């Protein structure tokens, strides 16, 4: 078992870290990076768009379960 003598600050969870970075010196010192926050936002947008596509009712009169759940979430938040 390892020796755990160090104490982590609670603020360490909010640190922005580079996960993937590209340095292009040919384009005038161009730096492009994907951070942990960018990854979380990308995953969140993907999940929301997938849920919205599943809840699309295709102009039917009677809503399906996905559509009802989406309307319930909208009514709760709005």
Curated annotation (Swiss-Prot):
GO MF terms on file? Answer: proton-transporting ATP synthase activity, rotational mechanism
- Chief location of this protein within or outside the cell: mitochondrion
Keyword line: ATP synthesis, CF(0), Hydrogen ion transport, Ion transport, Membrane, Mitochondrion, Mitochondrion inner membrane, Transmembrane, Transmembrane helix, Transport
Gene Ontology cellular-component terms for this entry are: mitochondrial inner membrane; proton-transporting ATP synthase complex
Residue stretches spanning the membrane: 34-54
Q: How does it assemble?
A: F-type ATPases have 2 components, CF(1) - the catalytic core - and CF(0) - the membrane proton channel. CF(1) has five subunits: alpha(3), beta(3), gamma(1), delta(1), epsilon(1). CF(0) has three main subunits: a, b and c.
**Which family does the record claim for this protein?**
Belongs to the ATPase A chain family.
Q: What is this protein called?
A: ATP synthase subunit a
To which species is this protein native? Aspergillus amstelodami
What is the gene name? Answer: atp6
